[in-house]
């Protein structure tokens, strides 16, 4: 059991036959009243993010999540195929569970799958990912007022705003949490 007073980012727990991961927890106590905890949580089965409220001292059942490192192999229509680095076993995961992550997955990318018992919940990808720009329009002269940006397309098909100096063929770093440009990558 996990005391809700100890909630912090990344803690996983079970409630109402669902598995949740804490994204953010806010603890508050008012005067003589009892403490309360508001937690922003992600349902690991559906991907839905909700806010749950608890009375200080409540307990929830801990969910023991296993993480396994795998490589992304390919997209097979309705599913993606991953391979276990240790056993070379291949598994398929429905794309509906990894819709956002698909924007950043390139062949051979290292990911972690999260398993509960024998059920695969979702995948975790690195926070910052290097991707190659495949389409970048030329910068327009005179378009240089406050923080000029242009829309580029990366190798996964994802489109994002970048500074004007980014050119086709360059490697850029993209945040997998926000989908925003973070900087130039290692252009070899």
UniProtKB/Swiss-Prot annotation:
It comes from Mycoplasma mobile (strain ATCC 43663 / 163K / NCTC 11711) (Mesomycoplasma mobile). Keywords: Cytoplasm, Elongation factor, Protein biosynthesis. It comes from the Bacteria. Involved in peptide bond synthesis. Stimulates efficient translation and peptide-bond synthesis on native or reconstituted 70S ribosomes in vitro. Probably functions indirectly by altering the affinity of the ribosome for aminoacyl-tRNA, thus increasing their reactivity as acceptors for peptidyl transferase. GO terms for cellular component: cytoplasm. The gene is efp. GO terms for molecular function: translation elongation factor activity. InterPro entries: Elong-fact-P_C, NA-bd_OB-fold, Rib_uL2_dom2, Transl_elong_fac_P/YeiP, Transl_elong_KOW-like, Transl_elong_P/YeiP_cen, Transl_elongation_fac_P, Translation_prot_SH3-like_sf. This is Elongation factor P. The keyword Protein biosynthesis applies. Belongs to the elongation factor P family. Pathway: Protein biosynthesis; polypeptide chain elongation. GO terms for biological process: peptide biosynthetic process. The keyword Transport does not apply. It is found in: Cytoplasm. HAMAP family: EF_P.
């Amino acid at each position: 059991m996990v005391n809700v007073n100890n909630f912090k980012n990344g803690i996983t727990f079970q409630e109402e036959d669902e598995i949740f991961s804490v994204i953010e927890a806010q603890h508050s106590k008012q005067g003589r009243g009892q403490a309360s905890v508001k937690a922003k949580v992600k349902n690991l089965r559906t991907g839905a993010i909700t806010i749950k409220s608890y009375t200080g001292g409540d307990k929830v059942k801990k969910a023991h999540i296993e993480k396994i490192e795998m490589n992304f192999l390919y997209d097979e229509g309705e599913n993606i195929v991953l391979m276990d680095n240790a056993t070379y076993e291949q598994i398929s995961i429905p794309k509906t569970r990894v819709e956002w992550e698909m924007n950043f997955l390139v062949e051979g990318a290292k990911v972690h799958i999260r398993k509960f018992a024998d059920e695969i919940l979702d995948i975790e990808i690195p926070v910052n990912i290097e991707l190659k720009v495949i389409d970048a329009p030329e910068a327009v002269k005179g378009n240089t007022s406050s923080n000029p940006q242009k829309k580029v397309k990366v190798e996964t098909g994802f489109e994002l705003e970048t500074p004007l100096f980014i050119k086709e063929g360059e490697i850029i770093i993209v945040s997998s949490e926000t989908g925003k440009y973070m900087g130039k990558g290692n252009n070899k």
